[in-house]
Amino acid sequence: MQVILLDKVANLGSLGDQVNVKAGYARNFLVPQGKAVPATKKNVEFFEARRAELEAKLADVLAAANARAEAINALGTVTIASKSGDEGKLFGSIGTRDIADAVTAAGVDVAKSEVRMPNGVLRTTGEHEVDFQVHSEVFAKLVVNVVAE
């Protein structure tokens, strides 16, 4: 199925690209989320008329993401208190939701889906570096300090 992308989609293309995707991917994901429209003649003409407007909107979203990434980087460190045993092992773990809540409480709105933890959840006390993917092109880093309660 041919679609016109209205947003940058990872591993697929950027704004304005006409790509061929499976019908289910287009029907169930791209179109409902507003990331693409079917590539009919009418939609192609409509898109070409609105191209500048969509590019400006995409640039605004990118600028907002850069501002949020700078705010996350400016925080430097966030401290989370959790119950732990004698040797620094936590009872339970600290996951993406806990980190997102702590950063939001510190003053920067972050969704749990933006937190990237390649090594899995945090299970020990100490300082851990956590990545944030605020936008498909914008990343931020933050140190999470886990302390015993």
UniProtKB/Swiss-Prot annotation:
Cysteine pairings via disulfide bonds: none
Entry-linked Pfam families: Ribosomal_L9_C, Ribosomal_L9_N
Q: Does the keyword Flavoprotein apply?
A: no
GO BP terms in the entry: translation
Question: Quick check: keyword RNA-binding in the entry?
Answer: yes
What are the recorded GO MF terms, alphabetically? rRNA binding; structural constituent of ribosome
Alphabetically sorted, this entry's keywords are: Ribonucleoprotein, Ribosomal protein, RNA-binding, rRNA-binding
Gene Ontology, cellular component aspect: ribonucleoprotein complex; ribosome
User: Signal sequence span per UniProt?
Assistant: none
PROSITE patterns, per the entry: RIBOSOMAL_L9
Which family does this protein fall into? Answer: Belongs to the bacterial ribosomal protein bL9 family.
Q: What does this protein do?
A: Binds to the 23S rRNA.
Q: What is this protein called?
A: Large ribosomal subunit protein bL9
**Originating organism:** Enterobacter sp. (strain 638)
